[in-house]
């Protein structure tokens, strides 16, 4: 699972190839690219670019493989909810963006590396 956050005026690229060789029968595989496109506060229009190209190369007959790509913006109802609880808009956007990114970081098995990644993400500026 690949995740990316496209800040305003930035771009992300995902070219994923999942190859299943002929002798890898009964393989079960999934490839996904999830992308969050941020806009300049107040503009409502994402200015970052996302390029996602998931690809399956299946040489075996008896497999179960799938792939997908999603691109979207922060959900306005989630921002509204946080704002209705007294969270300023910039902080609400930051919380939701971090939640999106940290879903992947939480899967890292090494605790030291996971904490370093979390600290790095939390130190990034708001967009």
Regions found by a protein language model. Give the residues of each.
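Active-site gating/interface segments in enzymes
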Residues: 1-127
């Amino acid at each position: 699972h690949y995740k990316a956050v496209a800040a305003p005026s930035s771009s992300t690229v995902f070219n994923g190839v999942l190859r299943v060789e002929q002798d890898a029968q009964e393989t079960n595989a999934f490839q996904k690219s999830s992308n969050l496109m941020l806009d300049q506060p107040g503009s409502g229009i994402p200015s970052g670019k996302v390029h996602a190209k998931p690809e399956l190369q299946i040489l075996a007959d008896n497999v179960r493989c799938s792939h997908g790509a999603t691109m979207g913006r922060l959900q306005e109802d989630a921002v509204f909810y946080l704002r209705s609880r007294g969270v300023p808009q910039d902080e609400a956007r930051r919380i939701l963006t971090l939640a999106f990114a940290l879903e992947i970081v939480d899967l890292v098995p090494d605790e030291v590396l996971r904490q370093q990644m979390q600290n790095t993400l939390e130190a990034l500026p708001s967009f």
